[in-house]
Curated annotation (Swiss-Prot):
The keyword rRNA-binding does not apply. Acyl-CoA synthetase required for both the import of long chain fatty acids (LCFAs) (C14-C18) and the activation very long chain fatty acids (VLCFAs) (C20-C26) by esterification of the fatty acids into metabolically active CoA-thioesters for subsequent degradation or incorporation into phospholipids. The transport and fatty acyl-CoA synthetase activities are genetically separable and are thus independent activities. Esterifies VLCFAs in the peroxisome matrix. The VLCFAs are actively transported into peroxisomes by a PXA1-PXA2 heterodimeric transporter in the peroxisomal membrane. ATP binds at residues 235-246. The FACS motif is required for catalytic activity and substrate specificity. The keyword Transcription does not apply. One of its GO terms (molecular function) is long-chain fatty acid transmembrane transporter activity. Keywords: ATP-binding, Cell membrane, Ligase, Lipid droplet, Lipid transport, Membrane, Nucleotide-binding, Peroxisome, Transmembrane, Transmembrane helix, Transport. It is an enzyme of class 6 (ligase). PROSITE patterns: AMP_BINDING (PS00455). One of its GO terms (cellular component) is cytoplasmic side of plasma membrane. It is a multi-pass membrane protein. The gene is FAT1. This is Very long-chain fatty acid transport protein.
């Protein structure tokens, strides 16, 4: 990686082995001591384990893929059916107190699969959109579509209006199959969808259980599916202002899910609890599909709840829980309970555990392993940290000598101009590698061999190409931009710093600043908008902040109640701006790009706000934006006010 130079590492190793500072030792004890010292300093054993694990393109992974292709069994459905053959009565799913064995769940989704064929005439390779909250039926629909060789468009059930219509049209589907519980989000869009030939069907438990045809789906239906075929779309917010569909190929899903299962060493005795939404890759791939590969049990919650989380974990006897960073903080902020340590959890697996939460979470809930993953649905490459002690607490990876020897020119941290979010270049026009402990954007090298597997956005070549950059270190080279700021310390520990650009995370969701700005900009009294995320004490992610100025006659007299209603009627709850900064004029760069750097740095601390700018906020439970001053700020700092 950029922060540790290969030549220096070799020099260090040579000095270690030959320099006068190393005492002369003899015999087995001396050799063992020297080996231990080298291992501790250069993380040799850690690198060997990492490079041989499931998350690297090892020979074992290649053999697995080749074997599945030869067998013509490359789908998750095929893996599931093999578990049915091996352990038909073993529990696959626990949901709201009910348990399905692998055999029972197979029979259930087979009935759904036959309905898709018999009633809807869904074809092999056809895309079908499913929209709904976490439920057994949602999983049945996904596996049923997989079983018949169709692809699944996983819609975010929070979406409505233009965002929902955009996602449905993007995936070019004939059918949207939606949970009856979110009918209110779907029906306002029915007219426009039906005009383009899209049909809407609703499901609930009674409908799914009433389906009669349980004829096994013939293997011949899916035997010709190729690895590069589309298996699904998972949506992410981006700088275009509307969600983008990340293309999940059959090969990527097979390789990723097997790799995670292998890396975590998932077994039939494992039970993984998740309350993450099934339309996200976290619950879909990092939990459900990976557990299927391992033959274990998925413990699914409908959604996160302080009251239900630990009781469900305890009752299900889960030994692994899945988290995102915010979840750890929410649980810590909850009242202490006898359930806190009454569970059997040995590992918390997820991404985004914040440094101020990490050790407090482990200590309070007595969880030995915090297993942090750095990856993204639309990203390339991944990092992991299986943390069991203080040395690697709070980081996303540990890189040693062997890793740097092999990958230092494949993954590189480069310096960034944080005002423009552009890569800084030297006088020759090439990127500048970061020094030790210097934050920079992570770039992943693209070669002819890796280009085919690089992430892409469905039907959006412009967005796909925007993640790639050329002439980074030499003319003609090609790299993938992660969009994330990371840093590496002198010990080889890698830390997540922040997200770049026009997307930030809040409550496990990616929020597009352009999408929010477009919606808020249609309010009659607002002339221009600048949306950005600000850090708030005691909260993970960034809170939505809207910098705006009114039309001249309305500069002061903005109707704040109407503005709040305007936002809530048109945006998902997690995207509604919580803070307003009303200013006489927006600031632009020389190339007419809106300035965000100073606004992000000043945040919502009233003492840092200068000039004529005024702050407002939307308090929890309020229907109107109210003035935000020192008293409200102190309430957030003291954690008396929670967002």
């Amino acid at each position: 990686m950029a922060c540790m130079h290969q030549a220096q590492l070799y020099n260090d190793l040579e000095e270690l082995l030959t320099g006068p500072s190393v005492p002369i030792v003899a015999g087995a004890a001396g050799a063992a001591a020297l080996t231990a010292y080298i291992n501790a300093k250069y993380h040799i054993a850690h690198d060997l384990k990492t490079l041989g694990g499931g998350l690297t393109q090892s020979s074992e992974a290649i053999d697995f893929i080749n074997r599945r292709v030869a067998q013509k069994r490359v789908l998750t459905h095929h893996i599931f059916q093999e578990q049915v053959q091996k352990q038909s009565n073993h529990p696959f799913l626990i949901f709201e107190g009910k348990t399905w064995s692998y055999k029972e769940f197979s029979e259930a989704y087979t009935r759904v699969a036959n309905w898709l064929i018999d009633e809807l005439d869904v074809q092999v390779g056809e895309m079908v959109a499913i929209d709904g909250g976490n439920s057994a039926e949602h999983l049945m629909l996904w596996l049923a579509l997989d079983a018949i060789g169709a692809a699944t468009s996983f819609l975010n059930w929070n979406l409505t209006g233009a965002g929902l219509i955009h996602c449905i049209k993007l995936c070019e589907c004939r059918f949207v199959i939606a949970d009856i519980d979110i009918k209110a989000n779907i029906e306002p869009c029915r007219g426009e969808l039906e005009e383009t030939g899209i049909n809407i069907h609703y499901y609930d438990p009674s409908f799914i259980s009433s389906l009669p045809n349980n004829t096994p789906i013939p293997d011949s239906r899916t035997e010709n599916i190729e690895l590069d075929s589309v298996r699904g779309l998972i949506y992410t917010s981006g700088t275009t202002g509307l969600p983008k569909g990340v293309f999940i190929s059959t090969g990527r899903e097979l390789r990723t899910d097997w790799s995670i299962s292998k890396y975590l060493n998932l077994k039939p005795t494992d039970r993984m609890y998740t309350c993450m939404p099934l339309y996200h890759a976290a619950a879909h791939s990092l939990c459900t599909a990976s557990v299927i590969h391992g033959g274990g049990t998925v413990v699914l919650s409908r959604k996160f709840s302080h009251k239900k989380f630990w009781p469900e974990v305890v009752a299900s006897e889960a030994n692994i829980i899945q988290y995102v960073g915010e979840l750890g903080r929410y649980l810590l902020n909850g009242p202490k309970s006898p359930y806190d340590r009454a569970h059997k959890v040995q590992m918390a697996w997820g991404n985004g555990m914040r440094p101020d939460v990490w050790e407090a979470f482990r200590e309070r809930f007595n969880i030995p392993i915090i297993h942090e993953l750095y990856a993204a649905t639309d990203g390339l490459g991944s990092m992991t940290n299986r943390n069991a002690g203080p040395f690697t607490a709070n980081c996303i990876a540990l890189r040693g000598l062997i890793w740097h020897w092999k990958f230092r020119n494949q993954e590189v941290l480069v310096k960034m101009d944080l005002d423009t979010d552009e890569i800084m270049r030297d006088r020759n026009g090439f990127a500048i590698r970061c020094a030790v402990n210097e934050p920079g954007q992570m770039l992943f090298r693209l070669t002819p061999e890796t280009l085919a597997g690089a992430p892409s956005y469905y039907n959006n070549e412009t967005a796909t190409q925007s993640r790639r950059i050329t002439d980074v270190f030499q003319k003609g080279d090609l790299w993938f931009k992660s969009g994330d700021m990371l840093r590496q310390d002198a010990e080889g520990r890698v830390y997540f710093v922040d997200r770049l650009g026009d997307t930030f995370r809040w409550k496990s969701e990616n929020v597009s600043t352009n999408e929010v700005a477009d919606v808020m900009g249609t309010f009659p009294q607002i002339a221009e908008t600048n949306v950005y995320g600000v850090l708030v004490p005691g909260n993970d992610g960034r809170v939505r902040s809207l910098n705006c100025h009114g039309r001249r006659r309305d500069r002061v007299d903005i109707r704040f109640a109407a503005l709040a209603k305007h936002a809530r009627d048109r945006l998902p709850g997690y995207a509604v701006p919580l803070f307003l900064r009303v200013t006489p004029a927006l600031e632009y760069t020389g190339t007419l790009k809106i300035q965000k750097g100073r606004l992000k740095q000043e945040g919502i601390d009233p003492d840092k706000i200068s000039g004529e700018d005024k702050l407002y906020w939307l308090p929890p439970g309020s229907d109107i934006y109210l003035p935000f001053g020192k008293m409200e700020w102190q309430g957030i700092v003291d954690k008396r006010i929670r967002l």
